[in-house]
A protein has these predicted regions:
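Short S/T/G/P-rich N-terminal loop/turn motif that feeds into the first structured element of a domain
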Residues: 1-50, 54-66, 75-97
Length: 97
């Protein structure tokens, strides 16, 4: 079952996002199971990430194998985890961009 995942990190920056995203290879080597990914600046600062994944397992595999190591490499230790809102997707349309 496809899932959507929303994270809002008011104490983060787009610069940190760009660095960690690059280290995790999100754009250069999209993770297996990723359907859709966006990152945007929150009003007043911070970062919002919205993803759609083929399954919760695909997201958790990416998180363990690529995201957490990239975060450790960038920050030295893991920052407090952001709240994640994960929901099952009822309907998904992906027209060409």
């Amino acid at each position: 079952m496809a899932i959507s995942m929303l994270q809002e990190m008011p104490n983060n920056t787009l610069e940190n996002y760009d660095t960690v995203s690059s280290k995790a290879g999100i754009e250069s080597d999209p993770p297996e199971g990723l359907i859709f990914h966006t990152a945007a600046e929150l009003e007043g600062g911070g970062v919002r990430i919205f993803n759609v994944w083929e399954s919760r397992e695909a997201f958790e595999r990416f998180q363990e194998e690529r995201l957490l190591p990239a975060l450790r490499e960038h920050f030295g230790e893991l920052p407090p985890p952001p709240e994640q809102k994960i929901t099952e997707v009822h309907h998904l349309v992906t027209p060409s961009l």
